[in-house]
Swiss-Prot record:
Keywords: ATP-binding, Cell inner membrane, Cell membrane, Membrane, Nucleotide-binding, Phosphate transport, Translocase, Transport. The lineage of its organism: Bacteria, Pseudomonadati, Pseudomonadota, Gammaproteobacteria, Moraxellales. It is a peripheral membrane protein. It comes from the Bacteria. This is Phosphate import ATP-binding protein PstB. GO terms for molecular function: ATP binding; ATP hydrolysis activity; ATPase-coupled phosphate ion transmembrane transporter activity. Residues 6-247 form the ABC transporter domain. Belongs to the ABC transporter superfamily. Phosphate importer (TC 3.A.1.7) family.
Amino acid sequence: MPPAKISIRDLNFYYGDFKALKNINIDIPEKKVTAFIGPSGCGKSTLLRTFNRMYDLYPSMHAEGQIILDGSNILAKDMDVNLLRARVGMVFQKPTPFPMSIYDNVAFGVRLYEKLSKAEMDNRVEWALKKAALWLEVKDKLRASGLSLSGGQQQRLCIARGVATKPEVLLLDEPTSALDPISTGAIEELITDLKNDYTIAIVTHNMQQAARVSDYTAYMYLGDMVEMGETDQIFTNPAQKATEDYITGRYG
């Protein structure tokens, strides 16, 4: 396995008294795509949200253990969470463009963390939209509302917004589940391109998608990490019978 970008050690996560993640120990390799699969409620989206501490917004939720990003424990009390979220971008299940222009959607996060001149911001917005394979479709209407775009375009706009702050890690929580097959294919191609520059973790219910886009796959069940390995191995020769049962449709 390549060097780890994120190392998770003895991670437990709680919703109040409910233990949603149980003693997770895995490494997320750098500049690869790692997919998390498993039935609804298995903890895969919860795990993804620990990587940028989204749960901090909810007082009843807390994590224990360590999540090491480039040598620093992001669960430490003195971690600058705003800076963390600049380093670890996130794209959600449904496209979430802000009710503002396409340009301002992309510039929004950058303005929080950097002081750029107008020319520098123009260049950053163009760069991010090109990264998200959206520039050619919107370059002549940057002042139009982000809400005016199609669903697939909106999701690519959200990816552009996510990469505009130049994060090191990109979290994708079922990024194509609300999209049509053509838009899904475009996002999957984009994911393959983006891994050249980013460490990507994706949650998906679509096992065919996991097989297509990921280098590594982790199977979770009821808050446990059942198995993680190279995607080809997980799908053709899993070590655990529970993984095989899920992948072959015998689960449940």
